[in-house]
Amino acid sequence: MARLFGTDGVRGVVNEFLTPELAYHLGRAAGTHFGKEKEHPTFLIGRDTRISGSMLESALAAGICSVGGNVVIAGVIPTPAVAYLVRQQGFDAGAVISASHNPYLDNGIKFFDSNGYKLPDEVEDELEKYVRQSADNELARPTGDGIGKIEFNSNLAHLYAHFVRHTIDTSLEGLTIVYDGANGAASSVGPEILSGLGAKVININVNPDGLNINHHCGSTHIEGLQVAVQQHNADLGIANDGDADRCLLVDEKGQVLDGDQIMLLCALKLKEEGKLKGDTIVGTVMSNIGFHKAAEELGMKTVSTAVGDRYVLEYMREHNLSIGGEQSGHVIFLDHNTTGDGMLTAVQVAALMKEKKQPLSELAGIMTKYPQVLVNVRVATKTGWEDNDLIKAAIVTAEGELGDEGRVLVRASGTEPLIRVMAEGPDQETLQSLCEEIADIIGREQGLAE
């Protein structure tokens, strides 16, 4: 049996891979695991705005209750809100039903422990064992008062909003902000946070209908936000993804700031305040060369992990560091929350703009981005490419052409049937050509997905 859990929980097309039956068995598995230490563990469940969310929420909650766990349903709420609230409200575990930046056809289920951290591999392996046992009807079925209860609490999102607002000491009064909620989990709470801090907020893509999450909007389709910022003569644009654990920004000139630039700005602020632990920022292998160079010039160190916020977080916890994240906009402020938090990230930068009395385009000038090209190859199989001689030769050839002024990175996606080809260096056209050559060979050798 293939492993259920990927790099960010269990994820797939709803009613094909991620069925309500699987959600039910995952609930029974999680209830069994967390029930080993407490007779009636209480779970907090949140979800994004996908049409399948309430169906999977019901199945997951039923599974948890069927083995004796209790459930509090928060409804539509960002992933980082669940991570925070589990810890702050004393829940025994949390679960989020979301496929993050993926299209609405997909959904996913991921769990958090009582400290708000995603589960380690060994616990996910145990849950998979319990899922198989549940499917074979081998797990306990308590009766009477051994069955768990379900409650609904729609106030929890407001507690999260209050928390985010109080991570800064600065009013945002005087700032005009365009907010793109990706028709996702922060469509209500995002505007609540920003307006509560005094900003003038123009909202776009905050009307979810179950089908429009991430559809030509949010952090994966930021073009509309760029236009809106300039149309409204705004100071800042903020884009979340579907579950609001990531954030990209747009400056007053319509230019995009990615996670590398956001981390650098926030890390420098922490350093100036004496709060940047180890004077170190944790990025990934996808971080831009310019990110590393700028950090060094500003007296900070950088570390690169594998792609995936779980690997960034793992390194941060092991080495007691303050800030880390991904170019895609997952930024973790470990002194505030235990996962990437799009709204928390956004208000840190907005506060910095107010404190420095500088437009974002000027603040972003501390880093010069090297051109970077990314080509995604949708493949029939994403395993075995590392051992393919033709693919290896194409990568070596490209690396030789770039020399010391650039690099090539090829990796399989952890969540989709993709192999990603990235090249970085001084010349955009050269990078595009090299990436396409490698991508063509990968497509031929691995087979293109239908």
Question: Over which residues does each language-model region extend?
Answer:
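Gly/Ser/Thr-enriched, mixed-charge loops and adjacent short helices
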Residues: V13, N107-H232, E450
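Short glycine-rich phosphate-binding loop at a beta-alpha junction
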Residues: H40-D48, V72, T176-V178, D279-V285, ...
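Short beta-strand-to-turn element immediately C-terminal to the catalytic PLP-Schiff-base lysine
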Residues: F111-S114, L248-E252, I332-L334, E424
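Proline/glycine-rich low-complexity loops and linkers
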Residues: D125-A161, H166, E252-G325, I332-F333
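N-terminal small/polar loop signature for handling phosphorylated ligands or for N-terminal nucleophile
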Residues: T32, E39-N107, E192-V250
